Amino acid sequence: MTVFGMLRVTPVTDEDITEEVAAAIEALENHDVTYETNPMSTVIEAETVDDLLAAVGAAHKAVPGDHIETLLQIDDRRDETFAARRKTEKVEEELGREARSDRE
């Protein structure tokens, strides 16, 4: 996989947004992408930028509401192919440990 995206789809509201965020993530299932959600965003991997943008568009459209904000950052690796997890593994190799704290 060569295209990575960091996606954040947020309905603008004072209410809880868990259901809406879940709808955006569920929409990714209909696309040829892999993804991992964290508390701040969802990292998406796709073979092409077109695949990534189609998935992002579906996630955005899946969120109900009158005011939706979507933030997308794209890393388009055209010179080599590797998974996003490899980026984290390289940092962890340099650290000699997992790239996270032991605190809870």
Where are the language model's segments positioned?
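Charge-rich, low-complexity N-terminal segments
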Residues: 1-104
